[in-house]
């Protein structure tokens, strides 16, 4: 087992990464406050792992909420179902929520934990690659609105993150590839390109799910993320760099309809759009862009949305983004592989060119 610690002062917490962690009750129970525990999961994950978690909680008063599975259910209506379950069971402020599932479950559970009785504890048990390397770490919680992704939410840190890589054994190949988009994103953000080179050299074995490499990949991804979050918890500066490809990607999800593309699939195209704009702005070479595209393709990720989205609708969707300031879209671009920056003075004609290249 590998352990990381996200240093946020009194809000610091461990991230456990390993095999068969769902059999190690002490890892979970030592982070539970009070006697009441609510497990939030979905219809896909519940038959696979709910009983395992329940078996660790026999000394607690526990209940569960089983939600429908999918990004389209990441709404205030679904969140209200969790609130209702907590109130009906008379859970008090000392309770702990457990998010057992992927990013949608984790984001909604965290949002409920941030809001219920003005804040209760919660624990992340991510079961998808995307949630293990990204959404379970860092305290971002929230839901989608019909006009924009993750526009309603809060920062609320978990008490721990428990990553059992055996949950990836039941993850389908499309979901696994979706998680690889966020992994590749870290490769593009990390100085010296050590992680990017690791991914290039091992992409075949990683896609074949070689466990020793998966643990290392998840560990390095989480390490890179916590290094940034520890410096900028509330995304006032450097943490914004973690949104590479996300302004484009969120617009894809919003325009196509949530769930049409998996989040990581949208981010894959978004990363390529950001790198293409970086190339047109004179930062990246065509060879560097080709390297990035090649890695995304080897991870079985989409690289285009041609014929799927109207360019004008796409541009409108880009304006509904948390990074928009005074009506100006702020983008994360690459000066070179391993060095991202926040850009708000890009050439609008070049942005239009990129959107048209990818949409039409």
UniProtKB/Swiss-Prot annotation:
Pathway: Metabolic intermediate biosynthesis; chorismate biosynthesis; chorismate from D-erythrose 4-phosphate and phosphoenolpyruvate: step 2/7. It is found in: Cytoplasm. NAD(+) binds at residues 69-74, 103-107, 127-128, 140, 149, 167-170. Its EC number is 4.2.3.4. Zn(2+) binds at residues 182, 246, 263. One of its GO terms (cellular component) is cytoplasm. Keywords: Amino-acid biosynthesis, Aromatic amino acid biosynthesis, Cobalt, Cytoplasm, Lyase, Metal-binding, NAD, Nucleotide-binding, Zinc. SUPFAM superfamilies: Dehydroquinate synthase-like. NCBIfam families: aroB. PANTHER family: 3-DEHYDROQUINATE SYNTHASE (PTHR43622), 3-DEHYDROQUINATE SYNTHASE, CHLOROPLASTIC (PTHR43622:SF7). This is 3-dehydroquinate synthase. It comes from Vesicomyosocius okutanii subsp. Calyptogena okutanii (strain HA).
């Amino acid at each position: 087992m590998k352990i990381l610690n996200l240093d946020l002062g009194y809000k610091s917490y461990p991230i456990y990464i390993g095999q068969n962690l769902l059999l190690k009750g002490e890892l979970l129970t030592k982070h539970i406050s009070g006697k009441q525990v609510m497990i939030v999961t979905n219809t896909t994950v519940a038959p696979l792992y709910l009983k395992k978690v329940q078996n660790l909680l026999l000394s607690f008063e526990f209940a569960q909420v089983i939600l429908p599975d999918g990004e389209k259910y990441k709404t205030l209506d679904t969140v209200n179902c969790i609130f209702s379950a907590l109130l009906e069971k008379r859970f008090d402020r000392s309770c702990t929520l457990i998010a057992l599932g992927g990013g949608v479950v984790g984001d909604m559970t965290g949002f409920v934990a941030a809001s219920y009785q003005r804040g209760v504890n919660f624990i992340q048990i991510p079961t998808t690659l995307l949630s293990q390397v990204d959404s379970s770490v860092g305290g971002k919680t929230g839901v989608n609105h019909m006009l924009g992704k993750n526009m309603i939410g809060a920062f609320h840190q978990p008490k721990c993150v428990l990553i059992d890589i055996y949950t990836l054994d039941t993850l389908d190949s499309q979901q696994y590839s979706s998680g690889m988009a966020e992994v590749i994103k870290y490769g593009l953000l990390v100085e010296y390109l050590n992680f990017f080179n690791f991914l290039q050299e091992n992409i075949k074995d990683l896609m074949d799910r070689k466990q020793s490499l998966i643990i290392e990949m998840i560990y390095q991804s989480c390490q890179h993320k916590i290094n940034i979050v520890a410096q900028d918890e509330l995304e006032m500066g450097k943490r914004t760099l973690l949104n590479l490809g996300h302004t484009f990607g969120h617009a894809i999800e919003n325009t196509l309809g949530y769930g049409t593309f998996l989040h990581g699939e949208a981010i894959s195209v978004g990363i390529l759009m950001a790198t293409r704009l970086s190339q047109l702005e004179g930062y990246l070479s065509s060879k560097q862009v080709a390297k990035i595209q090649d890695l995304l393709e080897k991870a079985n990720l989409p690289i285009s949305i041609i014929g799927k989205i109207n360019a004008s609708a796409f541009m409108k969707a880009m304006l509904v983004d948390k990074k928009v300031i005074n009506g100006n879209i702020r983008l994360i671009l690459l000066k070179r592989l391993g060095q991202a920056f926040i850009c708000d003075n890009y050439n609008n004609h070049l942005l239009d060119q990129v959107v048209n290249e990818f949409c039409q």
